[in-house]
């Protein structure tokens, strides 16, 4: 369902990667966001307006499959009042909301979702927000390189759709998303081999 109050808003999305630290630094430096959206257990440790948790609640409540996230989610899920977008409802999580998958997929003409974060990007595109500020979305999983590469590719696919729609995308400085943490002189393949490499930066006006 379209929420008119989200159209044109400035949104922060915070996930569990190291660059989540840049979110807290941004608050220290007086940055303000219309809403903060958390990914999974970030909702339990950061004040969020919405949380995206596309795994079924039972993954956290009935199994240990989520590893070290399990304990904090078991404490938080039954008690929070923060809206949690997920794939199925569970009476033990009273604030859970079904993610509007069909509406989002139809509106964005895509159903490419191989991890939780792209669901938040697609929701933002569907709601026509003005800007996304991305923190903790790093995909630096040393033990599962394939998952990291696949997840990053899916996220960057959705960010491309957001950019094409005119959305402003800001990525945390220490995140590898969109090669943001790469030295600026190394971001243009081939040119990076020159003694004096060209540097190309696209600003929010597209110039």
Regions from the PLM with identified roles:
Residues 1-207:
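Metal-ion/cofactor- or nucleotide/acyl-coenzyme-handling active-site neighborhoods
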